[in-house]
Amino acid sequence: MTLPEDTTTAESLIHTSVLSAEVLEALAPTPGKTIVDGTLGGAGHTRLLLEAGAHVYGIDQDPFALDRAREAGLPNLTVLQGNYRDMVSLLEQAGVSQVDGILLDIGVSSFQLDDAGRGFSYHTEAPLDMRMSQSGESAADVVNTYEEEDLAAIIYEYGEDRLSRRIARAIGQARQKAPIETTVQLAEIVKRAYPGFSKGIHPARRTFQALRIHVNDELGALRDGLQAAETLLRPGGRLAVISFHSLEDRIVKRFLLGSEVLQPLTKRPVVASDEEQAINPRSRSAKLRAAERVVVQEAS
């Protein structure tokens, strides 16, 4: 991957992080605490945790995100390359067995969305990639090789799109003429499959979401990451999870309700204030759930 000219500073690293004040309240960072940012991304949340005095272990599978964090020279930040689903082993390799807090900001980060070349956005022309890392199959591999029935299942399950079969059929017909290689190609195919679309939310949004979730196994990673949090958090440690759609939020909610060692801090998810939503439209769908690691008393 070719990196841009090195103009990175601690200030330029920040992206627009959602629910920043709420995350700080949930994790309560103070000097001496060790906190894991399992989804480092643009390091917006990490910067705030560092300013509060915590030592942060930032995990990301995106090498570009890690390079930017290293170049920023943020003190008390240790970066680790990998998926947060593997954070137990990643931290063990760094000599850490327990932590005071864990943050998971699920999905694609703002700076990944804004990087046209990554293929996450249907608004700009780019190779149809969508991989957080550079390993595994890309979104182009999926749309060009999967059976229509399997494509429909992915779009329905992960995109919750009622027209999944119609979209899969349109993809199948289009790829018979030529491979689908770019984001705009796919977006136009999906748009044509929607009857009477004129304006509003682009009909490709759900399909792109579904492909991204599938390509990166995001829901599987979330389940593994939640289990890892139970292992890593010391008693009194806090977990904060930000999700952006109902699939993720349901997984987090059910996991916390079923956990014997994680006690939810709020009955309902925390959402962005009206002021934040006006400033940062991406925060409108964000939901924060937080929990505290408790000690389970063994029955006598």
UniProtKB/Swiss-Prot annotation:
Q: Which domain of life is it from?
A: Bacteria
One Gene Ontology cellular component annotation?
cytoplasm
Q: Does the keyword Protein biosynthesis apply?
A: no
GO terms classed as biological process:
rRNA base methylation
Recorded GO molecular functions are: rRNA (cytosine-N4-)-methyltransferase activity
User: InterPro entries under this entry?
Assistant: RsmH, SAM-dep_MeTrfase_MraW_recog, SAM-dependent_MTases_sf
Quote the EC number.
Answer: 2.1.1.199
* Listed CDD domains: AdoMet_MTases
User: Is S-adenosyl-L-methionine found in the keyword set?
Assistant: yes
Subcellular location(s) per record = Cytoplasm
Q: Which reaction equations make up its catalytic activity?
A: cytidine(1402) in 16S rRNA + S-adenosyl-L-methionine = N(4)-methylcytidine(1402) in 16S rRNA + S-adenosyl-L-homocysteine + H(+)
Tell me which PANTHER family the record gives.
12S RRNA N4-METHYLCYTIDINE METHYLTRANSFERASE (PTHR11265:SF0), S-ADENOSYL-METHYLTRANSFERASE MRAW (PTHR11265)
- Relate the protein's function as given in its record: Specifically methylates the N4 position of cytidine in position 1402 (C1402) of 16S rRNA.
What's this protein's family per the entry?
Belongs to the methyltransferase superfamily. RsmH family.
Protein name (Swiss-Prot/TrEMBL): Ribosomal RNA small subunit methyltransferase H
Gene name, per UniProt, is: rsmH
